Amino acid sequence: MSDKIRLLEGKVSSVAMDKTVVVRAERYVKHPLYGKFVKKTTKYYVHDENNECKEGDVIKFKETRPYSKTKKWCLVDIIHREK
């Protein structure tokens, strides 16, 4: 693993699990043939120790040690709360 910490931002799409939130992060990728930028969405399972996130919040999260088979990201900060 490299020394650089990967930080990402995304919108919380599910808070159904205990201490875990599902986050959708969007990125733009250039199509190899046509050159148009296409929006890609990736789903991340993020560890939320205090269950402080709500659905619709925009959060910042970082890569960390594996908490489970699918959960390898940890909550850093809540950027914007959904009303």
Curated annotation (Swiss-Prot):
A GO term from the CC aspect: cytosolic small ribosomal subunit
GO molecular function: rRNA binding; structural constituent of ribosome
TM region positions: none
Family matches, as InterPro entries: NA-bd_OB-fold, Ribosomal_uS17, Ribosomal_uS17_bact/chlr
Top-rank taxon, per record: Bacteria
Any single GO BP term: translation
Subunit structure: Part of the 30S ribosomal subunit.
Functional note: One of the primary rRNA binding proteins, it binds specifically to the 5'-end of 16S ribosomal RNA.
PANTHER family documented for this protein: 40S RIBOSOMAL PROTEIN S11 FAMILY MEMBER (PTHR10744), SMALL RIBOSOMAL SUBUNIT PROTEIN US17M (PTHR10744:SF1)
Protein's UniProt name: Small ribosomal subunit protein uS17
Species this protein is from: Francisella tularensis subsp. tularensis (strain SCHU S4 / Schu 4)
Lineage: Bacteria, Pseudomonadati, Pseudomonadota, Gammaproteobacteria, Thiotrichales
Gene: rpsQ
